[in-house]
Amino acid sequence: MAKPYEFNWQKEVPSFLQEGAVFDRYEEESFVFEPNCLFKVDEFGFFLTWKSEGKEGQVLECSLINSIRLAAIPKDPKILAALESVGKSENDLEGRILCVCSGTDLVNIGFTYMVAENPEITKQWVEGLRSIIHNFRANNVSPMTCLKKHWMKLAFLTNTSGKIPVRSITRTFASGKTEKVIFQALKELGLPSGKNDEIEPAAFTYEKFYELTQKICPRTDIEDLFKKINGDKTDYLTVDQLVSFLNEHQRDPRLNEILFPFYDAKRAMQIIEMYEPDEELKKKGLISSDGFCRYLMSDENAPVFLDRLELYQEMDHPLAHYFISSSHNTYLTGRQFGGKSSVEMYRQVLLAGCRCVELDCWDGKGEDQEPIITHGKAMCTDILFKDVIQAIKETAFVTSEYPVILSFENHCSKYQQYQMSKYCEDLFGDLLLKQALESHPLEPGRLLPSPNDLKRKILIKNKRLKPEVEKKQLEALKSMMEAGESAAPASILEDDNEEEIESADQEEEAHPEYKFGNELSADDFSHKEAVANSVKKGLVTVEDEQAWMASYKYVGATTNIHPYLSTMINYAQPVKFQGFHVAEERNIHYNMSSFNESVGLGYLKTHAIEFVNYNKRQMSRIYPKGGRVDSSNYMPQIFWNAGCQMVSLNYQTPDLAMQLNQGKFEYNGSCGYLLKPDFMRRPDRTFDPFSETPVDGVIAATCSVQVISGQFLSDKKIGTYVEVDMYGLPTDTIRKEFRTRMVMNNGLNPVYNEESFVFRKVILPDLAVLRIAVYDDNNKLIGQRILPLDGLQAGYRHISLRNEGNKPLSLPTIFCNIVLKTYVPDGFGDIVDALSDPKKFLSITEKRADQLRAMGIETSDIADVPSDTSKNDKKGKANPAKANVTPQSSSELRPTTTAALGSGQEAKKGIELIPQVRIEDLKQMKAYLKHLKKQQKELNSLKKKHAKEHSTMQKLHCTQVDKIVAQYDKEKSTHEKILEKAMKKKGGSNCLEIKKETEIKIQTLTSDHKSKVKEIVAQHTKEWSEMINTHSAEEQEIRDLHLSQQCELLRKLLINAHEQQTQQLKLSHDRESKEMRAHQAKISMENSKAISQDKSIKNKAERERRVRELNSSNTKKFLEERKRLAMKQSKEMDQLKKVQLEHLEFLEKQNEQAKEMQQMVKLEAEMDRRPATVV
């Protein structure tokens, strides 16, 4: 159940304040003296009231009271005489006068003095009044409470007879209704209704006043909303209708459902019980339009989360992690040139929550040699330094306990610096932080202490001496003082240029002042008061001021620091800014630098991210540029976006910048410190304040504001209109675009009923603020309100307005409908809705099942069937095991490794489009075939040569064998012929011996012949075998050569093929990239055209913002697409190279196998070789 936040805005008012006491009252400026006034404070602490006999009742709003203090005895003789006349002599006044300081801004302060009967009463009332003022919670009460407050004010503003004049009531409603209508309404309520009538306070109850407001300015806007909720069917809302309204409209859908539960019937009944005035309806669980109106005007419907007004942030982070409310030239009440300086300004800004004030310190010119504070040589009046220190002491920790930083702009001599140091030490006492905390020593890399560590401490920001110089001078000072030399402080204080602070650490001029080209004389300074008065009275023309400004030049602060003052400087040591990289290298967290707004903007423009990172580590201070002599302010939001801590403003000027500042620092208990967002503190996060896309970890928001109506905007019959602006990051800032129509002649209850003003994309809600401002028909501001977006509540809300000084106005409110939700880019709405509420977005299958059920077919009747896959899926998934065991052809070049899944598969698909190369393909190439032909020709030529040599040797061998055979035959024939002749000659009987002898000779011849044949055959066999071996070797050699040439050629051809593949893939990639760019350009043009033709966009600025946002979104999207494409293409190229490498390795392996095969053939041939010859 949603729980209501208990807003305890009321402070306990002491009983003696409620009972009252008699004081004599006077005012010094206009000489008002009113004796015997009965002063009281109401039970709620809204008003300090007083009334004396025969006088009208008077009130002073406690929200306008800045301080209560004891006052000195007046010096005005008239006042002293008046007090003497009522029996209070000057000698009796000590400790009996209290001063009430009040005002609607920080400059125009009024002082009311109250003289008590005795000092005890004065002391009691000072403490009592101090306990109830500065109630920042009471500045955020609901419209219903504001109505009650106004009713109480009317009851206090009685006439001399103690009754309420009807005229004072008519003034409340004078802006929209005629007096007759008001008189008639009073008559209907049974109250006196004549123009000059009076009403008894007892008869004028709050309920009567509330009914009167409803009669004179009925809330038709809430009535219309009421009818819209119940469908205009009844005069009440049921519990269910109220719950539905609360959850759908009054609750931010982005909130965590556990921490911020939805409303339920029980909570709705609590609301009805609390706000429904009709008891009968309460019993029935119904709420009327009057009860509904009361609820919408209650604290439960505050426009901001009221707990954000408390101290809700962690205060234990380093100082550099906070925005710090800071003032520039705090002492000035007006212009920078010829302006008036005031001690009171220090009190007012500190009481307003400021935590960093500026003191421009100069040597006093009087005989007393007292240091003064003034805007150096800019013709401003002077105030005493010690008076300022006293004022700071009295007010530093009244509204906030967190540390105050005194930003010294030190132009004093060493002697007067010593006086300044002693004043700080003596007046501040333990409040002054003179030494660094033990837990946070002044060492590089050590974090700054937190606001909690420095509670109720005052820090001085001033240049500091080098440690060795400081130590040396302190020792000299100590020894001289111990020696009893009265002039010791003065002697050590003499300015010397030898021991100044390190030049590298001199601060870039933190606050440039003016001086004439020639030094001013004492006479020049004696005229400062007169010049200031002349400027104030308008006697000095703009031309004179410009001429004076032109003759001035800047004077820097002194670098010759007194060692005693130097010892008081710790966590705010200004140094000259030498660059972000230098600061990062030094890593000294207690060093800080100041930048005027122009320099700051320059660094922000060129080094935005570095500036943010610098501010994570150490502090920076921004101050207005010198040209702002009118004390106008720059826009602080720009520097908050960069994480700058001390964004110093001219508090005396309640312009837009100051309104933003005060509206922002109203959060976190108005303590003056706001914790920066997480990504602006963490060193591991990078933040660009000019980013146009959501920050990592931060959810962008959409905010729409519908301005419905206004209430009690003015007591005059004037026209009014409302402006709604947003300030934040440059991309989130929208100003001067959204304004309602002018409603004429009705300052009481104008109804605007405008269409919603939509801030479509707020990328950093943590830094954004909403500003709602009401102007009259002369464009004069009536009221405004600053609402930080991170604490804004959704729904129908009444927004109470503030004046330009951020003081609450009594009754003026704006009734708005605020819608907050997570930003969803165009085109993603359905997806987000489906994710946030899946029930509303059933799947197609579920929808079809519902449709079938509607036709009478039950779910049980529907069989589950396998999902059908596409042919491509089947191809990719069919028989994976079988595919893995299929043998590869030895001639195919395929990768042997398994490709990675996901993007690897995608890359693989890409290269599959490139034709694959096989060995067969390479062998069919023309170059390879030509080379084979050439090799075959060489081999044939060799074989032909070998055949010729075979034939020649064969003929030679045959001839030699034939010759031996012929010689054998011849010799054998000769022996046979000799035998035949001998036989014929001697006869057969006498030839036996000759025959025998002849046979022996023939045998010998045959034997010799065989021996010769055997020798010649052996010789021939040897010659033939050698020739065959030689021929075989030559043929094998040429075959080996040919094989090597073939392998090398195949390798070259494969490399060429790979180069062609690579080139082809590159061309494919270039074509893809070109097509993507063309497609992206087309999309960009179409989107821009759609925006230009979108009739729902009604102003040029919104259209330009949409186009800018679109371009930023498209740029990011397109870069991502190109990045993904580049990654895909890179993977494809890597995959191709991998496959090509595998192909090449495979070819090398095949070539090695071929060579091994060749060697085996050669070895087999050698093993099979036998001696041979040709016969």
Curated annotation (Swiss-Prot):
Name listed for the protein in its UniProt record: 1-phosphatidylinositol 4,5-bisphosphate phosphodiesterase beta-4
Pfam annotation, one family: PLCB1-4-like_EFh
Occurrences of domain PI-PLC X-box (ranges): 313-463
Ranges of biased composition (kind: Acidic residues): 493-508
Taxonomic placement: Eukaryota, Metazoa, Chordata, Craniata, Vertebrata
Region annotation (Disordered) ranges: 487-512, 860-904, 1082-1110
Cofactor(s) demanded: Ca(2+)
Tissue specificity statement from the Swiss-Prot or TrEMBL entry: Preferentially expressed in the retina.
Gene3D superfamilies according to UniProt: 2.30.29.240, C2 domain, EF-hand, Phosphatidylinositol (PI) phosphodiesterase, Phospholipase C beta, distal C-terminal domain
Source species of the chain: Rattus norvegicus (Rat)
Gene designation: Plcb4
Gene Ontology annotations for the cellular component aspect, listed alphabetically: dendrite; glutamatergic synapse; nucleus; parallel fiber to Purkinje cell synapse; plasma membrane; postsynapse; postsynaptic density; smooth endoplasmic reticulum
Biological process according to GO: lipid catabolic process; modulation of chemical synaptic transmission; negative regulation of potassium ion transport; phosphatidylinositol metabolic process; phosphatidylinositol-mediated signaling; phospholipase C-activating endothelin receptor signaling pathway; phototransduction; release of sequestered calcium ion into cytosol
